[in-house]
Structure formats: C-alpha cells, structure tokens
A protein has these predicted regions:
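N-terminal nucleophile
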Residues: 1-118
C-alpha cells in the first residue's frame, strides 16, 4: 500500500537498480525509503568495485546500515560485478532469488542461511 503520489525506489536509477559497464549491475528490494536514502544499488556497486572479491561483505554491510537507519526495514539486493562475482544479501527473513551461470545447474533460495548478526 502506497500513499497517493508516493514513488517507490524501483524506478529510480541508483536506488532500485543501477548498471554500468565497469561496475556491474545491481537490483534492490525492500522498504523504498531505506533504499532511496542510501542510493543502495549505486553505492553497493561503487564500493564493490573498490574491493574486488568482497562484494558480499560490502553489500551486507550496506543493507544492514540501511535497515538500521530505518527501524529494521527489510532491505535486500542482488549484485553482479563484471568479473562474474555475485552477491545476494538481505536484511529480512525472506528474499527469493535464483541464479544461473553458464551450463551450471541453477541455484535458488528464499531464507537467510546466516543468523541476523552475521
């Protein structure tokens, strides 16, 4: 349910999604205000580009910060770097996702595998 005139984060480049040839691509989901105020998709890609191999750690940290600053809001993202590194993280009990790379069998998930503090 959205208030009249409210625009969510999804259509806003940098918040709900972002793609760049040198940075990769990222899509977000969750409470729009938390995602918008942190420009989550862009920031996750920008920071992951500075520390290759650590995209999941960086994305998890950004999601946790966005969630904390908005009273535990549900926030999640899927990030893919140009080198193929993938990060799928969320600060919520559930976030459905699926991943298929090349000829490998697809993978998918719904629940967090880690405790909320990790």
């Amino acid at each position: 349910h959205k208030l009249p005139g409210r625009v969510g984060d999804t259509p806003l480049c940098g918040a709900g999604f972002y793609a760049h040839p040198q940075l990769g691509a990222c899509g977000t989901t969750g409470v729009g205000e938390a995602i918008l105020t942190h420009v989550l998709a862009f920031e996750a890609l920008r920071r992951a580009s500075e520390r290759p191999g650590e995209a999941a750690i960086i994305a998890a940290s950004l999601c946790a910060a966005a969630s904390r600053h908005h009273n535990g809001a549900a926030v999640g993202l899927i990030l893919v770097r140009p080198d193929g590194e993938v990060a799928i993280v969320h600060c919520s009990e559930h976030m459905s996702w699926a991943l298929a790379i090349g000829d490998a069998a697809p993978d998918s998930g719904l629940r967090r595998d880690l405790s909320p503090g990790t």
